[in-house]
């Protein structure tokens, strides 16, 4: 399938070419998938990158926008995003959270509902791959949140590029992309992204952590070294899990032998 002219024009930019190349190194799926689009810079950049990838690889790709109805303007925003994506032949469907909204734990419950809706859509279409826009800043935030909660090794490195959740593969191809690069793609391609006011609300733990990380960065935190630390912890966790599995198999074999 040919890449539409308006998408080809966007690909003529050198920085876009470089970011697309990096994306293709991290995304090697060869079957149909669903992409979650919120309207933020990360998910709009993901919509653009996956669209190019799906055309190049002749793959079926569906785009889903979830309207949580937590803000009065959310429905208009969802419609605007759908229209904007359509300009680039990215066909999106809007799913709506219709139930009564809770007064407490709103962010975590909205996240759970979003995944419920997305997983249902995956099952409806018999698609096992769901692609989401978590990026490097999310990886750092998740690490610090888990550390504050006293998580063990597995919890500290829980944000993986591929996570199996029942029958669904949750895929995060942007984990080594910085937020500023995703903002660049969104601005350059769509000249738009949604600024969610909850991203500035310091009553939410994630926003407090984000501000602390930014303070660390301003005081010399080396993001490359932090990324390397998380990468090394992941390797340690993988090694540990490997030996646990080996030990289980060995004990299972010995149990069978003893019973004989």
Locations of regions flagged by a protein language model:
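ATP/NTP-dependent adenylation/nucleotidyl-transfer catalytic domains that generate, transfer
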Residues: 165, 203-260
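Core alpha/beta nucleotide-donor-binding catalytic domains of modification enzymes
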Residues: 1-212
């Amino acid at each position: 399938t040919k890449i539409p002219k308006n998408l080809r024009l966007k690909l003529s930019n050198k920085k876009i070419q470089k970011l697309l190349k990096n994306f293709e190194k991290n995304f090697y799926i060869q079957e149909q998938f669903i992409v979650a689009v919120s309207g933020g810079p990360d998910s709009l950049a993901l919509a653009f990158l996956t669209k190019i990838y799906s055309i190049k690889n002749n793959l079926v790709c569906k785009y889903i926008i979830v309207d949580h109805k937590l803000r009065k303007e959310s429905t208009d925003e969802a419609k605007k995003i759908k229209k904007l994506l359509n300009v680039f032949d990215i066909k999106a469907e809007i799913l709506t959270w219709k139930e009564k909204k809770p007064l407490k734990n709103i962010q975590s419950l909205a996240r759970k509902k979003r995944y419920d809706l997305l997983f249902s859509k995956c099952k409806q279409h018999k698609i096992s791959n769901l692609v989401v826009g978590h990026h490097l800043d999310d990886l750092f935030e998740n690490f610090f949140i888990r550390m504050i909660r006293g998580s063990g090794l597995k919890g500290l490195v829980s944000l993986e590029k591929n996570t199996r959740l029942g029958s669904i593969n949750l895929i995060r191809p942007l984990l080594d992309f910085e937020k500023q690069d995703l903002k660049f793609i969104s601005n350059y391609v769509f000249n738009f992204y949604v600024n969610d006011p909850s991203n500035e609300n310091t009553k939410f733990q994630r926003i407090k952590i984000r501000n602390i990380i930014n303070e660390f960065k301003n005081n010399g935190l080396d993001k490359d070294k932090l990324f390397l630390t998380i990468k090394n912890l992941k390797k340690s966790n993988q090694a540990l899990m490997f030996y646990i599995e080996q030990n289980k198999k060995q004990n299972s074999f010995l149990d069978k032998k003893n019973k004989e």
